Amino acid sequence: MIDPMLTIIIPTHNRAEILGRCLEHLSEQTFQDFQVIVVDDGSSDKTQEISTSWSFRFPHFKYVYQKNQGQGNARNNGLKHATGDIILFIGDDILLERTAVQGHMLMHKKHPEKRIAVLGLVLWHPEVEVTDFMRWLTSGKDGGTQFAYDLLEGKEEADYNFFYTSNISIKKKLLEKHKFDQDFHSYGWEDIELGYRLAKEENMKLYYNKNAVGYHHHMIDEKSLADRMRSIGKSSKIFHKKHPELKKLPPLWKKTALWLISRKPVLMLAKKYRKNFYYYALSKRYLLCGLRQV
């Protein structure tokens, strides 16, 4: 059997139900010449059962189990089994539009050189009730911390800060020397850090294809912000140690400013009158906590 052109790698942990829907959407793609690799990062639910039940829908399918070591390690593990010349990373809660994979492949056909990566668009799934908090999360101009696709409006290229592994494809040759750094154990920065290394050392060029759409089927509430931002804070210190030239950590004056805007009186006023600023200030309160934890 001839190896497929593309390998799709999906790291997952205890989300069997949505993983099944993710695989269902892959089975409906207009472009089908791909290998699917599900990397189970130590799940205790029915992830293996769901994966096996869908494996018969794909000529090239592999289920890989590992002890819980995080998404970056899971993606690296998936790469060991990848046979395609192009790698597409997606999240287990990303439901791709029928033409999304084709959109990635057309862009790679247009730009066949080895140093190319393609960023697809991620939107909230129509079934998900999008709250004010979730809208802020995906608003780059308001300091949201999930995605910042609004900053790419009208653009065809993006820099390493947009190396989002929820929906991104890349030539496998680019990843022969560069893997996800396993020093990142908490949420945040491990994908951006890889993107930076690829841009710096391999001159990676990241194209943006807004027509390669994936829908994020994941309800996120405000209660998760504390853990999310503390993790980002811890990871940002690791990032800074590796790449101090980027100055990703806020200087003392900015830490002081962030501390001031995240005091309770300011938060109370912002919550009442300026919701996006409230979420931004609250996120910085937890970020500062994370910076102190490392």
Where are these regions (language model features)?
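Non-catalytic, C-terminal membrane-associated alpha-helical segments of glycosyltransferases
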Residues: 230-234, 248-294
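N-proximal low-complexity "stem/linker" segments adjacent to membrane-targeting elements
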Residues: 1-27
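Short aromatic/hydrophobic "clamp" motif used to bind/position activated sugar donors
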Residues: 87
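A conserved acidic beta->alpha catalytic loop
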Residues: 25, 40-49, 91-95
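Glycine-rich, basic loop-to-helix element that forms the pyrophosphate-binding segment
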Residues: 66-82
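Acidic donor-binding loop at a coil-to-helix junction in glycosyltransferase catalytic cores
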Residues: 187-194
